[in-house]
Amino acid sequence: MSYINKKGKTTSWRLMVIRQQVSEVIANNQITTTLTKAKETRKHVDRIITLAKKNTLASRRAAAAILLDTSISTKDQLIQKLFTDLQKKYTSRNGGYTRILKLGRRKGDNVEEAILQLV
């Protein structure tokens, strides 16, 4: 993610953007974002769903450390959704829980947009 490594973009900013987007994907099943952010967020969403498939206390705590409150769900609701609904949905699937659909370029700054959604 070359745009993140520029001056003024700190590590804490990068991690917070990823945490926010992971939480939004879990809450809404899809988000619209830039292509580079979608590619980076995809790794973390797949990782957190793999944690949910283990369903141990340690995996719940690891997921709780990543997820944040969203506008429609609290952190506890997201953890509940992750460890009940999504865990059952992806038990027979080994990876590849998300897909990226390209939307084209945004009018204002000509950056490529994409939809990151759960399969």
From Swiss-Prot:
One of its GO terms (biological process) is translation. GO terms for molecular function: structural constituent of ribosome. The keyword Ribonucleoprotein applies. GO terms for cellular component: cytosolic large ribosomal subunit. InterPro entries: Ribosomal_bL17 (IPR000456), Ribosomal_bL17_CS (IPR047859), Ribosomal_bL17_sf (IPR036373). It holds the Pfam family Ribosomal_L17. The keyword RNA-binding does not apply. Keywords: Ribonucleoprotein, Ribosomal protein. HAMAP family: Ribosomal_bL17. PANTHER family: LARGE RIBOSOMAL SUBUNIT PROTEIN BL17M, RIBOSOMAL PROTEIN L17. Part of the 50S ribosomal subunit. Contacts protein L32. Belongs to the bacterial ribosomal protein bL17 family. This is Large ribosomal subunit protein bL17.
